[in-house]
Design a protein with these regions (language model features):
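C-terminal motif of bacterial Sec signal peptides marking the signal peptidase cleavage site
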Residues: 17-20
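Bacterial signal peptide processing site
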Residues: 22-25
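Alpha-helical segments in soluble extracytoplasmic regions
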Residues: 31-159
Length: 160
C-alpha cells in the first residue's frame, strides 16, 4: 500500500514538471516578457521542480527520507509560484500565469499534511494524506492553465 502511495506522489511530481513552472528573472518591472523569454522562464523552474521530485520516482528508504524530499519539493513549488507572481507574462497568458502560480502555491500547502505525516513516521496518516491529494484541485487547475498555454503555441520546458 505504501508503494502505491509513493507511486501516486511520484506521478504528482512528474505532472508538476510536465505542467511547467516559472523561472528566475525578467519581466518584474511591469514590462511584459516576450513569448521566448516566458518560455525560457517556464523551462528553468520546470527543471528545478523535476530535479526536486526525482527522488520520489522510487520508494523512499524511510518516511523520514520522504519528509525531507517533500520539504525540498515544497520549497521548489513555492519558489516557482513566487517567480510566476514576480513577472509580467505576455498578455495572452496573464490569466494562465496567475492560475498556474496559484495552483503551485496551493499544492505546496496541500503537501504539508503528507510531509507532516511522513515526519511523524505514521504510515496510516501518510496514506490518508495521499488520498486527500488525489482529490486536489490545485494540480487540475495548474494543468488546465498549462494546457491553455500550449493551445496558444507556448512550449513549456522540454515537455511540450
Amino acid at each position: 500500500m505504501r508503494h502505491r502511495g509513493v507511486a501516486t506522489l511520484a506521478a504528482l511530481g512528474f505532472a508538476l514538471a510536465v505542467a511547467g513552472c516559472g523561472g528566475g528573472g525578467g519581466g518584474g518591472d511591469g514590462t511584459p516578457l516576450t513569448k521566448a523569454q516566458y518560455e525560457q522562464h517556464l523551462a528553468t523552474d520546470s527543471q528545478a521542480i523535476t530535479k526536486a521530485f526525482q527522488p520520489l520516482s522510487t520508494p523512499p528508504s524511510s518516511l523520514s527520507v520522504l519528509a525531507s524530499q517533500l520539504k525540498v519539493g515544497q520549497e521548489k513549488l513555492r519558489s516557482a509560484a513566487d517567480d510566476l507572481n514576480g513577472v509580467t507574462p505576455p498578455k495572452d497568458v496573464e490569466k494562465d500565469n496567475q492560475a498556474l502560480a496559484k495552483g503551485l502555491q496551493t499544492l505546496a500547502d496541500e503537501l504539508e499534511s503528507l510531509r507532516s505525516a511522513a515526519a511523524k513516521k505514521d504510515p496510516a496518516l501518510v496514506q490518508k494524506a495521499l488520498n486527500g491529494l488525489k482529490s486536489s484541485h490545485a494540480l487540475v487547475d495548474a494543468r488546465a492553465a498549462t494546457d491553455d498555454m500550449r493551445k496558444k503555441g507556448y512550449k513549456l520546458g522540454g515537455f511540450s
